[in-house]
């Protein structure tokens, strides 16, 4: 039984799920919006929101914590210098998920996840 087991497996093992989350979070924070499946977008949202909330601390420790999840120094710099100050007064809810239809090949629901 799955009582109390939050999160989705996405047909991947734990290291592949972590790699997927990091890669998509990096892309989202670099570009501002990405298109992915609805399920992946729903998994990505809390991951990115925690990164932004951590970055709002603004100190060296916060930068190092963000760098643990985002392995691209340019994106870490952007998060610390541009994204976090933008949301300084906002207590959460930094992302929005919009459904954009279905994928032609397999009919899965696609979504656009973007920074508000």
UniProtKB/Swiss-Prot annotation:
Pfam families: Ribosomal_L17
Gene Ontology molecular-function annotations: structural constituent of ribosome
SUPFAM superfamilies named among the record's database cross-references: Prokaryotic ribosomal protein L17 (SSF64263)
GO CC entries: cytosolic large ribosomal subunit
Keywords: Ribonucleoprotein, Ribosomal protein
Record-stated family: Belongs to the bacterial ribosomal protein bL17 family.
NCBIfam families the record matches: L17
Quaternary structure annotation from Swiss-Prot or TrEMBL: Part of the 50S ribosomal subunit. Contacts protein L32.
Annotated protein name in UniProt: Large ribosomal subunit protein bL17
Organism for this UniProt entry: Deinococcus deserti (strain DSM 17065 / CIP 109153 / LMG 22923 / VCD115)
């Amino acid at each position: 039984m799955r009582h109390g087991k939050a999160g989705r497996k996405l047909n991947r093992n734990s290291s592949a799920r972590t790699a997927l989350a990091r890669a998509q979070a990096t892309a989202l924070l670099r570009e501002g919006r990405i298109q992915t499946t609805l399920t992946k977008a729903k998994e990505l949202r809390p991951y990115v929101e925690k990164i932004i909330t951590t970055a709002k601390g603004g100190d060296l420790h916060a930068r190092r914590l963000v760098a643990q999840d985002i392995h691209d120094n340019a994106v870490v710099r952007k998060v610390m210098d541009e994204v976090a100050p933008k949301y300084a007064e906002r207590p959460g809810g930094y992302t929005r998920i919009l459904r954009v239809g279905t994928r032609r090949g397999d009919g899965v629901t696609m979504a656009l996840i973007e920074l508000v």
